[in-house]
Amino acid sequence: MRHNFKVIEKKWQKKWEDAKVFEAQDFSDKKKFYGLVEFPYPSGAGMHVGHIKAYSSVEVVSRKRRMEGYNVLFPIGFDAFGLPTENYAIKTGTHPRQITDQNLARFTDQLKRVGFSFDWSRVIDTTDEKFYKWTQWIFLKMFEKGLVFRDTALVNYCPSCKVVLSNEDSQGGKCDICHSEVVQKSKTVWYLKITEYADKLLQGLKDVDYPANVKQQQENWIGKSTGAFVNFDVDGTDEKLQIYTTRPDTLFGVTFMVIAPEHPLIDKYADKIANMDAIKAYRTECQKKTEFERTQLVKDKTGVKIEGLMGINPMNGKKIPIFIADYVMMGYGTGAIMAVPAHDQRDYDFAKAFGVDIIQVIKGGDISKEAYTGDGEMINSEFLNGFTNKKDSIARMVEEIKKMGVGEAGVQFKMKDWAFNRQRYWGEPIPLVHCPSCGVVAVPYDELPLELPDVKNFEPGEDGESPLAKIDSYVNCKCPKCGGDAKRETDTMPQWAGSSWYFLRYIDPNNDKAFADRKKIDYWMPVDWYNGGMEHVTRHMIYSRFWHRFLYDLGEVNTPEPYAKRTIQGLILGPDGDKMSKSKGNVIDPLDIVEDYGADTLRTYVLFMGDYAAAAPWSDSSVKGCKRFLERVAGMVDMVSDDPSTDALEVSFHKAIKKVSSDIEETKFNTAIATLMALTNSVYSAGKLSKEQLEIFIKLLCPFAPHLTEEIWESLGHDDFLSVSAWPQYEEEKTVDATIEIGIQVNGKVRGTVLVAKDEDKDAVLARAKEIVADKLTGNIVKEIYVPGKIVNIVCK
């Protein structure tokens, strides 16, 4: 049989679609399996090979589950709001809706050409009003529960995109969209109180099957620490500066304080500050720096001492200077820190630069040269002197500050509340109204969805104002509460909004009464297997876990965690070993591979490249190798024989069933394919195989190369689909070779080998072994040992 992929692949894609083979059935009596991949952003560039690898893991598992008798939900959709589409619309004058529709059609065609077994009856699009109605509904539920608030703050702002960015979207001081430098800007921002769920998000990680590095990244991002809040009096005022520290045991070593340049204490006591001009100049410089630049550890220590304000160390009553410095942020902690230069290198460098006292309170090191950051005996600390256990000294200090009324134990999180508004057009409208009498009022639920108006100009204003603010007919409205004149909120939600709950909509995509029917949620949730990239571990995954946990607390969903299992894929690098990029000219178009070698070759190759979670370079020669493998598989059709196959080949088949089955579950796809390649070699060596053996082979290969295997299945006389036939089962006793080669030791040294049957009698094995090494047996044989299936040992004297 020839591997005529251009005919075969179109044929089977149409057959699958016509027969609705991959459509999931709600409430089936079968055991359910919900497989999920991160739905794509449909860019104008179309699909790339990274998409193929990302989707192929759960694709293979989902196909295997169907063959194992599961009711499988394996859906796909499009995360289609976002800046790239809007920027292209601004550039070309084409409406984002038109661009999105074109990109969706292109992506859909590309995905179908690869033969993914998605349930196309459940496709979702986050820009569809029927979808974002429920995004707005969930937002309003959060608003009702006090999880939405508005504040003026220094934010990460991209001057190029003219949009506010969350910390997650501006890592490294660069815009995640256009990679421009981010600046700090004071703006009014809508936040979601994700910090209220920090503990629940941490606890939830104990109940899910995520890779260790995924859990670790989420734990680090949430960043829970235990310590104490301590109040420092400001001399000559009624003010108290509250700080948070994880090392309250070092309070006797505090010799100065640092507050954020934006701290309100400065303006409140400006008349007491002698060097206000220097303070203002430093503030101006800070406004030019990004948050990333301000918080870098390796940089020159800058700051200004506030002349006229002094803090008081609550433990010893000593007056200590207060500085402003750029590395302290109002958005982190309390906007003020205590400094213990003897035991913190940044504080040490700062103290040396500004001539501040350094008092050692933990014995060790040489503080004339550097800070001592290790453990040791407490000194210069009154009631703590002599303590050597850090945990005990912290507990004792917390007890003391509580008794003194100057502090208490506390917990802090590195994660900050989620900046949730964008000053752009192509996003979900925020369903809130600003009323001069009633304040901020929610749009009534029965008026959802609040739809985007049709506009011609998508550019934001130069001051970063949303394009929607220019549309009077949209902005001006009546207050839902009092009926008076009011104005709509003109910012839109970030792209992360729709992806925070999309997996629930797949369950019931056409429901107009709820985001999904509760009985269907109870049947399908949680997601059994979710695959995606490491780049979404600390953004999308944390956001979606937060939204899902909120819905769980409302009683809207049945599980506290949305994803039972998470896996990750590594990058596909260019043939040169570098990350693929258009500028480097090393991008591989997956449809070129489909056109030249077939979808089955592409599917097989991306999983054969190496460890699924690791990065691997593209290799054209290996692509061709996978094509040759599939051609050899097609050739096996002509090798089917009624003559019985050898016992050795039968063992090879049972071994392959066992190995491929376990490898798929462990995402060891490369070794599963290698096993099938080796089995092909065994078949060709034998020169024949039975029809039943060929059927087993193509069932094992089907999840990887479904088009070719369906064609072979049909050629063997079947009129049903291989994709829903029964997954092969192995017999454990048949996974052991009928004969094995074992070593023969004489006086501890291997002198030969003997081929033995797995159940062969001991005496027969020893007799043949002695015959093989007869010339090595000098003297008398004093001991003969046979360890079945392992070794023969003969001792002579």
Locate each region found by the language model.
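Conserved oxyanion/phosphate-binding beta-strand-loop segments in alpha/beta enzyme cores
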Residues: 1-36, 66-75, 99-106, 282-323, ...
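Residue patterns forming the tRNA-binding/recognition surfaces of aminoacyl-tRNA synthetases
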Residues: 2, 11, 15-19, 91-241, ...
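Long, charged, mostly alpha-helical binding arms that flank functional sites
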Residues: 3, 224-229, 363, 371-399, ...
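NTP-handling and nucleic-acid-processing catalytic cores
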Residues: 3-13, 49, 135-358, 363, ...
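N-terminal catalytic cores of NTP/NDP-binding nucleotidyl/phosphoryl-transfer enzymes
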Residues: 25-96, 100, 123-138, 245-246, ...
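Secondary-structure transition/capping motifs at alpha-helix termini
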Residues: 63-71, 91-97, 113-117, 144-150, ...
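Helix-rich, typically C-terminal accessory recognition domains appended to large enzymatic cores
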Residues: 79, 144-160, 250, 409-438, ...
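Long, His/Glu/Asp-enriched segments that create or flank divalent metal/ion-associated functional microenvironments
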Residues: 442-479, 484-488, 494, 743-747
